[in-house]
Regions:
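Active-site-flanking beta-strand signature of metal-NTP-handling nucleotidyl enzymes
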Residues: 2-8
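Short, surface-exposed ligand-recognition loops at beta-strand->loop->(often short) alpha-helix junctions
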Residues: 9-21
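Residue-level signal for secondary-structure boundary sites
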Residues: 14, 61-63, 96
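An amphipathic, aromatic/His-enriched active-site/gating alpha helix that lines ligand/cofactor pockets
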Residues: 20-38, 56-91
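Short, solvent-exposed loop/turn elements at beta->coil junctions and helix N-caps
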Residues: 40-43
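Short acidic/glycine-enriched loop/turn segments that link adjacent beta-strands
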Residues: 45-49
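Short, low-order "capping/linker" segments at domain edges
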Residues: 91-99
């Protein structure tokens, strides 16, 4: 299995629109693309990323198919209008918490 790890900070003043996008567009559409969401963390204190999220696929080919899908590219571009310090990486799933 492979895991998509995403981290970002929500831009100040964008919180309401960001939450609306996250709940009404990003999460449902990513699930429809075939990504099984596994993690969603909100960091309130410290120097780390404000948001950490993850999702898995059965194999690398499925992950690559999702990430090359035009719908994913549109979602990612829209997410970038609400966030700073965006980071995306794909790793092999270890079963524990991954950064």
């Amino acid at each position: 299995m492979f895991k998509l790890l995403l981290t970002w900070d929500v831009k100040p003043g964008q919180e309401q629109e960001y939450i609306k996008f996250l709940t009404q567009e990003l999460a449902p559409k990513v699930i429809a693309l075939g990504l099984q969401l596994t993690d969603a963390w909100y960091n309130m204190y410290g120097d780390g990323p404000q948001v950490m999220a993850g999702g898995i696929t059965e194999d690398l080919a499925a992950m690559q198919e999702i990430l090359s899908n035009p719908e994913w590219e549109e979602l990612e571009a829209k997410l970038l209008t609400f966030v700073d310090n965006y980071r995306r990486r794909v790793v092999e799933t270890t079963g524990g918490f991954q950064l």
